[in-house]
């Protein structure tokens, strides 16, 4: 993708697209970036691009109308050209979010009755692969919208560790679903899918699934421990799937089409994975009250200052 300095673009922030302006362009080959007045600037730790993301092209963007504390690096999974097609997608995502919020209010007003009509949850896939979208039950999409508001507007964080964790959720789904499958082939495909989601989550969480406000919390929760006084090596950092829970799993599943379209999977395999994602989402919708924690904690001014300055 080609995005010029000071050029307009659209970026995903949570479930919606926002207008943004490119301030810097990072080149992974040289490990440098350029901005309006400089080229070949070496990337420093304080520039805020995580080490695990430096092997891919990134853009440092400013969201129009937002404070500069929200300026951040985004990868190709989150940035889109500013054109009529993506502006239409931006409007559609807003309409979907409003519909999800309205459905959630209706569901709360009528306990015991759940909305079952699904709604597209994932952004359009990159042009180089098959165009795919995961259809997410509307009540789960409403949870993602609520999650976005809690973090970006109310400056809250999901309470960690979650119960159940992503690992717990995937294990429970596998046990229940595999008991319903008579075919050994179908059981094997299910096992491969669950293991793949588990692996994707652990690998993608830190650089794709977190809001800027959450990164410091991630470092504290999954950054490992300092060596003990005895000089013994620090214990391995916990897998994110053993710390984070349902709402972060929903974030991953909503992005899955883009992630798999960037791989060498053929189109048939991509559609199979999407179908598996939709089956998992349907199961999560029936157990949403138990699987997706609504526990959020307030952040202090000191935490916000450090987290948003990272």
Swiss-Prot record:
Transmembrane segments: none annotated. GO terms for cellular component: NuA4 histone acetyltransferase complex; Rpd3S complex. It is found in: Nucleus. The keyword Repeat does not apply. Component of the NuA4 histone acetyltransferase complex. It comes from the Eukaryota. Keywords: Chromatin regulator, DNA damage, DNA repair, Nucleus, Transcription, Transcription regulation. The keyword Heme does not apply. Residues 104-128 are annotated as: Disordered. Residues 128-308 form the MRG domain. SUPFAM superfamilies: Chromo domain-like. Belongs to the MRG family. Residues 118-127 have a biased composition (Low complexity). GO terms for biological process: chromatin organization; DNA repair; regulation of DNA-templated transcription. Its main location: nucleus. Residues 8-80 form the Tudor-knot domain. This is Chromatin modification-related protein EAF3. Involved in deacetylation of histones, chromatin assembly and chromosome segregation. May act as a transcriptional oscillator, directing histone deacetylases to specific chromosomal domains. Component of the NuA4 histone acetyltransferase complex which is involved in transcriptional activation of selected genes principally by acetylation of nucleosomal histone H4 and H2A. The NuA4 complex is also involved in DNA repair. Pfam families: MRG, MSL3_chromo-like.
